[in-house]
């Protein structure tokens, strides 16, 4: 069975498919045809409702084209101020999964999300039949993880119902259905664990999914690391180490309801603009970038304080030893926002800046790798790639901070036991204890 990594984004959606033939693995990004019929690696997360109430998805304007004749990068899509005669709906993903007020009600956003996901499901089932399992990402922190995962499952189950039961895989009939009628046909299905297993749906925090290609390739050194995924609507952060099984051990998941939308004040932009893409760093407002960076710093400071607190509890060593250990730790950047140099900076001890590129991927297994790399799409496609790496379960949880020092604590306990046994052998006197006391 194929594994589909479904990265439902605020600005654009990316899909990667893992094909497994015996021991051979291949990863291929699903391509979407724009209004000119040119294949693109991303689909704009935009819905257009025309004067007749009919809905279009993704590429709304015939004016958006690939002038080079090649698959182009996100940034080269020219932002058109007009070109679609009707209502344009954007940022429904952000309104579905965050508390950001962007003018769309929660329930309306959920319905838009169901329809948009359905649109992509039609194409996936046309190409692969039903021989695939979806692994989808969600923006979340540790506290909201289960609720956010359930929301994703409900949206996917509702979309499957529309595609397979209501429209019987007839995409044209789906597109001919006016919005009001489509709303009447749509049911927001309650969460059901059995249905989740039936469809082999797995859901992962977006900040976790980004880690998988790097971990599989042994691209991150052991020790404490930070991943920052700057998206359109949110910025997701994971604090993790690599365990002896070469899998990430997550100690903190954080999601900030600020991404490129906030940085560019997109909510007050021209609503008729077709493209959601940020074309250059000049669109990022300085005062908003400073505010954004302060929120990241706040997360890092919280991490630092928690680490220091646990270190003092569990160790007799000076705090400077922890400070030294945190010097020049990796901070890994991914997501569309990370493509701008001004957005990649060190935070506290995390000073070794890594930007996702071809060298962090298992490039020999990725179809069109050279083209994707040349277009600078690796950080944009990274989450969908990570999501497509087949997993057996999605029981991801944050381990307690005290366990970061578990091995260190066990070594200290073992040393203490040795001292005790040595002292007993000499009638309760231990030269080791005496030396420690002198030190």
Which role fits each region the language model picked out?
Residues 1-10, 16-26, 84-225, 388-402, ...:
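Nucleotide/phosphate-binding catalytic cleft detector across ATP-hydrolyzing
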Residues 1-96:
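Early-domain small/polar-rich strand-loop-helix modules and first-structured segments
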Residues 10-12, 139-146, 231-236, 337-341:
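Gly/Ser/Thr-rich loops at beta-strand to alpha-helix junctions
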Residues 39-52, 242-302, 375-378, 438:
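Glycine-rich phosphate-binding loop plus the immediately following alpha-helix
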Residues 276-439:
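Helical "lid/coupling" subdomains associated with nucleotide-phosphate turnover
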């Amino acid at each position: 069975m194929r594994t589909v990594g479904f990265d439902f984004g605020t600005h654009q959606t990316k899909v990667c498919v893992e094909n497994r033939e015996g021991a051979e693995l291949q990863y291929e990004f699903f391509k979407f045809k724009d209004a000119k019929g040119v294949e693109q690696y991303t689909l704009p997360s935009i819905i257009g409702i025309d004067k007749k109430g009919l809905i279009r998805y993704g590429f709304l304007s015939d004016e958006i084209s690939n002038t080079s004749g090649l698959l182009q990068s996100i940034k080269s899509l020219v932002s058109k101020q007009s070109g679609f005669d009707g209502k344009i709906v954007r940022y429904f993903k952000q309104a579905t999964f965050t508390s950001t007020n962007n003018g769309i009600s929660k329930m309306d956003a959920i319905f838009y999300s169901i329809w948009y996901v359905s649109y992509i499901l039609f194409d996936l089932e046309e190409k692969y039949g039903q021989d695939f399992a979806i692994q989808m990402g969600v923006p979340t922190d540790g506290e909201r993880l289960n609720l956010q995962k359930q929301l994703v499952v409900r949206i996917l189950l509702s979309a499957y119902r529309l595609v397979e039961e209501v429209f019987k895989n007839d995409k044209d009939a789906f597109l001919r259905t006016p919005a009001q009628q489509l709303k009447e046909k749509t049911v927001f299905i309650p969460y059901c664990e059995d249905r989740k297993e039936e469809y082999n749906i797995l859901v992962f925090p977006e900040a976790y999914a980004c880690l998988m290609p790097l971990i599989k390739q042994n691209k991150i050194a052991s020790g404490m690391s930070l991943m920052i995924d700057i998206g359109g609507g949110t910025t997701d952060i994971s604090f993790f180490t690599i365990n002896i099984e070469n899998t990430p051990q997550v100690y903190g998941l954080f999601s900030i309801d600020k991404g490129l939308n906030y940085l560019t004040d997109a909510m007050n932009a021209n609503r008729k603009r077709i493209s959601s893409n940020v074309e250059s760093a000049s669109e990022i407002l300085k005062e908003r970038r400073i505010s954004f960076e302060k929120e990241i710093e706040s997360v890092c400071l919280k991490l630092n304080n928690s680490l220091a607190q646990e270190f003092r509890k569990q160790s007799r060593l000076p705090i400077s030893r922890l400070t030294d250990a945190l010097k020049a730790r990796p901070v890994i950047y991914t997501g569309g926002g990370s493509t701008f140099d001004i957005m990649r900076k060190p935070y506290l001890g995390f000073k070794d800046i890594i930007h996702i590129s071809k060298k962090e991927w298992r490039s020999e297994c990725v179809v069109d790798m050279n083209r994707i790399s040349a277009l600078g799409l690796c950080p944009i496609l990274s989450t969908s790639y990570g999501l497509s790496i087949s997993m057996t379960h999605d029981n991801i949880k944050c381990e307690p901070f005290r366990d970061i020092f578990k091995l260190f604590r066990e070594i200290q306990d073992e040393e203490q036991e040795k001292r005790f046994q040595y002292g007993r052998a000499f009638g309760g006197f231990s030269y080791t204890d005496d030396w420690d006391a002198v030190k």
